Amino acid sequence: MRPIHIAQLDKARPVLILTREVVRPHLTNVTVAPITTTVRGLATEVPVDAVNGLNQPSVVSCDNTQTIPVCDLGRQIGYLLASQEPALAEAIGNAFDLDWVVA
């Protein structure tokens, strides 16, 4: 499960950490996707809510991924569930206009 933390971006906001867990301890920066309550219904959004540790229904915005210093990460507040990983993969593929064939 991918962790959700509070991070200092334009303001303190929840983010989903996208960087692989196995390499995180060795890095000074991580790639994150911000989480927002502004839902646009885009194919690049992944719905998240209380089951993920959030106070209100929100979306992971894969159009706005960014790499930030690890020191900008605050406390962990939740996780993306394993069952939500396929939606995340699809949203990232849409955000970067990737074409792939799933075997």
Swiss-Prot record:
Q: Which Pfam families match?
A: PemK_toxin
Activity regulation note: Digests 23S rRNA in the absence of Mg(2+), increasing Mg(2+) concentrations decrease its efficiency.
Enzyme Commission no:
3.1.-.-
- Explain what induces or represses this protein's expression: Mildly induced (5 to 9-fold) by starvation, when grown in a non-replicating state, in the presence of isoniazid, gentamycin or rifampicin.
Listed as disulfide-bonded, the cysteine pairs are none
Q: Which keywords, in A-to-Z order, does the entry hold?
A: Endonuclease, Hydrolase, Nuclease, Toxin-antitoxin system
- Does the keyword field hold Nuclease? yes
Subunit details = Forms a complex with cognate antitoxin MazE3, possibly with 1:1 stoichiometry.
The name this protein goes by in its record: Endoribonuclease MazF3
Top-level taxon of the source organism: Bacteria
